[in-house]
């Protein structure tokens, strides 16, 4: 029995020894295990790599949004400039149409009508029941009167036409600088203070109301706050238009200056005209 037990133990040990032989290849198995674990570590480290494209995409979207906002603001400013230029050109067109209409009406009113006078005189002679001598004398008097009347109308029409042409040429001169704007503003202001009517003052000087409103900030700045002219600078026609210079003058009017302007407008020391610009 003891021999069997010893043999069994020996066989068991041998079997155990034989079973333990594969463990000598443990380094090979360890390398396989390490090789299998390596992809899992890579998978764990992948989320930070996947997060970087998202951040790049967000930054790109922000940049595109910023560019779109800048372009939108630029387009908005461009639209405002074009609208102001459209209003200015529309005012000039209305002014031209009204002046042409007034010229046509004045021409029709001042045009002499000799045929009508002759017809009236002949009708009077035909309807008369006096003798032939009286009719002939009456026709002679009427012809002399009509001739003198035509001559008087012709002289009157020529003088009035000359006077009207001078006024039209003087008033149609377009202002080209700040001094011209101020001079025109003071003329209209003096007429307004006499006539007590804005529309009649503009009609008297043959100037459109919107045209004056577009350049009003220049005149108000020169009258109320001439010290601010240093901030705005002198007008240079080679660098900017008069409309753009008027906008800069409007932006230079602070709250205190605007209060002074409103007070002077209420007392009729300035033209009570609204601005065409917005802050």
UniProtKB/Swiss-Prot annotation:
Cellular component, GO, one term: cytosol
Main location, first listed in the record: nucleus
Basic and acidic residues composition-biased segments: 109-121
Location(s) in or outside the cell: Nucleus
Annotated disulfide bonds: none
PANTHER family, A to Z: COILED-COIL DOMAIN-CONTAINING PROTEIN 106
Name the UniProt record assigns to this protein: Coiled-coil domain-containing protein 106
Record lineage: Eukaryota, Metazoa, Chordata, Craniata, Vertebrata
Encoding gene (name): Ccdc106
């Amino acid at each position: 029995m003891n021999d069997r037990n010893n043999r069994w133990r020996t066989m068991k040990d041998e079997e155990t020894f034989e079973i333990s032989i594969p463990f000598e290849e443990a380094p090979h198995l360890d390398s396989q295990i390490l090789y299998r674990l390596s992809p899992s570590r890579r998978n764990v480290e992948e989320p930070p790599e996947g997060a970087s494209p998202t951040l790049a995409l967000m930054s790109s979207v922000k940049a595109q949004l910023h560019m779109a906002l800048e372009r939108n603001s630029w387009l908005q400013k461009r639209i405002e400039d074009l609208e102001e230029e459209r209003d200015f050109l529309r005012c000039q067109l209305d002014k031209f149409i009204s002046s042409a209409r007034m010229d046509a009406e004045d021409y029709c009113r001042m045009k002499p009508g000799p045929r009508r006078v002759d017809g009236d005189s002949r009708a009077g002679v035909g309807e008369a029941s006096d003798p032939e001598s009286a009719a002939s004398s009456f026709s002679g008097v009427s012809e002399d009167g009509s001739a003198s009347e035509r001559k008087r109308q012709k002289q009157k029409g020529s003088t009035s036409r000359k006077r009207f042409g001078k006024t039209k040429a003087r008033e149609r001169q377009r202002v080209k600088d700040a001094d011209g704007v101020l001079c025109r503003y003071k003329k209209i202001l003096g007429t307004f203070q006499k006539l007590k009517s804005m529309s009649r003052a503009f009609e008297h000087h043959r100037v459109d109301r919107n045209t004056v409103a577009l350049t009003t900030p220049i005149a108000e700045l020169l009258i109320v706050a001439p010290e601010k002219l240093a901030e705005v600078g002198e007008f240079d026609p080679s660098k900017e238009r008069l409309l753009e210079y008027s906008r800069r003058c409007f932006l230079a009017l602070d709250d205190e200056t605007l209060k002074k302007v409103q007070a002077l407008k209420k007392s009729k020391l300035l033209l009570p005209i609204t601005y065409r610009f917005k802050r």
